[in-house]
Each structure stands twice: as C-alpha cells, then as structure tokens.
Amino acid sequence: MTVLDRFLKYVTFDTQSNEETGTTPSTPGQRVFAEALVKELEAIGMEEISLDENSYVMATLPANTDEKIPTIGFIAHLDTSPDMSGKNVQPRIVTYLGGDIVLDAEENVVLSQSMFPELSDYKGQDIIVTNGKTLLGADDKGGVAAIVASMQYLKDHPEIKHGKIRIAFTPDEEIGQGADHFDVEKFGCDWGYTIDGGQIGELEYENFNAAGAKIIFKGLNVHPGYAKDKMQNASLRAIEFASWLPAEQRPEHTTGYEGFFHLTGMTGSVEEATLSYIIRDHDRKLFEEKKELLRTLVDKMNEAHPGCAHLELRDQYYNMREVVEPQKHIVDLAFEAMTSVGVEPIVKPIRGGTDGARLSFMGLPCPNIFAGGLNFHGRYEFLPVRSLEKSMETVIKIIELSARKS
C-alpha cells in the first residue's frame, strides 16, 4: 500500500475532536481509527505495539544493526479540527493545470487561485482536494500516512541500516490535549519529530507561547421599561471590554513573530456574558505582558462596576525553542534529510502549536516536519501528492542519516 493509498483510506475515518466532552479521546471516532492503525502496524510487522485506555498508539521498529544509534521517535495525531466537519470526507485527485478548482458546483465552492495564490506552486502536480463540504484531514492524517508508509518501506528494505525507531499516534491534538497523557518514559526516545507541518519543506522548532482566557461578566436584569439606573447589561460590558484590547493585535493583522489576542467565542444575555480568548506570542516576555494586560483590564472593569468581571486564565503550552535550540543537531539532521531528498527546507516559526511543543518540555525535544497539506481546518484544504511522498522520504532519510552519523 502506497503512502497515497494509506492517506485516502485514513481520511474516511471521522476523527473530529470536541473540547466539550471532557473525555480522552474526546470523540469515539478517534478510538476506531486507533484500533484500525494497530491492525495495520501488526500487518507490517511492527513490534511492541500498544494501545492504551486513552487511545495513544505506540509501536517499535527494532534496530537492524548492532551499532549504537540514538532512538528516534515520530509522532502524528489522530484527530482533525473541530472547526469543520470531518465526516464522510470524499477526497478526489486532480491534476492541477492552473486557474480555479471547482469543489462543489451546486454550492459554488471554488478553490480560487486569486484567494489561494499558493496553488500556483503546484501547477502540473496531482493534488488531493475536498468535495467542498468537509475538511480534507491532511492535518494530520498526512503525517500518520507518512509515518506508517515509512515504517513499511524500512521493513521492505533491510539494506537500510537503522537504530531503534519508535512511533506514536496521539488523540486530541487539535484541542490542545494531545500530550496530556503521553508517556514520555514509555516512548523511550532520545528525541522525536512531529509530522504535523504544512507545506513541503516546513521545518519548525519555534512555536507560540499559548494561553486560554475566559472572562465572565455578571449583570442585573430588570424589565426594560423600568430599567433606568437599575439594569446592568453584562453583554454590553463584554463588548466594552473587547474594545479595550488593541485592535492591531488581532490575528487578521499579525504575521511572522507577531502575537495576538483572538476572540474565539462569545455568549451573552443581560444577566451574564462570556468572552473566550486565546493569547499567543513567540516571545515569552511579550506573552506575559499580554496576560498581564488582561488582568489589568479586568481590574479596570471591576473598578467601574464592582464584581462585574471574573477572569479565568490558563497557560496551554510554551515555545519549544528554549528546549530544542541547545540540541540543534536534531534540527540540522532534519534539514540535511530534506535537502538529500530534493526538498528545500523552510525554517520558520509555527504560528500555532504542536504536540511536540509540550513534549519538548516533558523531556522529549521534538521539532515539527511538514506533512504537505495547505489551508488546514476548512473546505479549501488540499494536499499535493508529491508533498506527501516527500514527507515520507524525509522520515526515511532522517533515520538513514542518523545511523550513518553514529
């Protein structure tokens, strides 16, 4: 089975995560997918295969040489984003010759070159697209496919000498819980790589520092006809609070290393209103300043309206750079591997996070490598077939180079 065959099979599993369930995995489809992967790993001859109660899959490709070689891990996640349906995904492969791609003629859903100019980079290539009704799931079933296919390749090519290789598939990465129950000691690696990046060539060892915030506003409701000097409208307090945050620090106005406040949700009535934010910044100092600004503004609101606002603030993950940079050789190894298979590395900060960010702080330095997809989390997601194949080749080459250098 080719890496493409595996990917097309994997996207048929509905594994959309859900942060509201409070379970691990957060949705039953992830367990179904995990169990199917266990059977595939058994079929290709992997060893030490485990599936725990939280649906973490781990397996081993034993060393085929007596040389002392570091144990490397490769990790991808089972779930797809809760932002868009992952049910009944119907991928199709088109040879892209330029222009727009009609995904759903009936609903006029078009993958437009003017809106997504990166399409032009793949002219002449086969690309996998959606039917315009769901996401594709390249994030991160592209990574899962690349890892499983690379293990199959190494089993079929014993002439490629390698050390012990560990692989893992995790649930609920998309809702920030992918590392919650990851057993780093059991995984037993010197370092790892998540195969969870985007376009071909992406190599990332910097990510956002991240926090989540919820501000709850209390009001007082009375009959609006008799509300003068009595009513306190919680929804209006929430709107006022949102206006105090710097508009230039919203996601739509930031890029590169610029952080942001992102209003992800709001609910409201006169009696109670809630604003949900995520706070992001690559720089730890600026990250802390953003959190402090929220605290200051909540205090300001409560000074004007005593007891009106309550802040719930929780750190989610931190920038892995401070852990990975002292072991830069693991980034250099991936860089060399990409170059060796004809891929130009694109080293840039992740404007997001991966399981590897938290795992790095849990004792497993873990940069991120491309899986090949673009426009994640929506109906315009697509995956060039060559990019998927090169992701697999990069995994194999990392393993091969690690053995040679040892």
Swiss-Prot record:
Annotated family: Belongs to the peptidase M20B family.
The record, for Gene3D superfamilies, names: 3.30.70.360, Zn peptidases
- Give compartment(s): Cytoplasm
Its biological purpose is as follows: Cleaves the N-terminal amino acid of tripeptides.
Q: Which residues form the active site?
A: D79, E173
Top-tier EC class? hydrolase
Q: How is the cofactor bound?
A: Binds 2 Zn(2+) ions per subunit.
This entry's Gene Ontology molecular function terms read: metallopeptidase activity; tripeptide aminopeptidase activity; zinc ion binding
Please state the Enzyme Commission number of this protein: 3.4.11.4
This enzyme catalyses: Release of the N-terminal residue from a tripeptide
The entry's protein name is: Peptidase T
Xref: NCBIfam families: peptidase-T, PRK05469.1, PRK13381.1
**Which cofactors does this gene product need?**
Zn(2+)
One Pfam family recorded for the sequence: Peptidase_M20
Organism whose genome encodes this protein: Parabacteroides distasonis (strain ATCC 8503 / DSM 20701 / CIP 104284 / JCM 5825 / NCTC 11152)
Entry-linked InterPro entries: ArgE/DapE_CS (IPR001261), Bact_exopeptidase_dim_dom (IPR036264), Peptidase_M20 (IPR002933), Peptidase_M20_dimer (IPR011650), Peptidase_M20B (IPR010161)
GO-annotated cellular components: cytosol
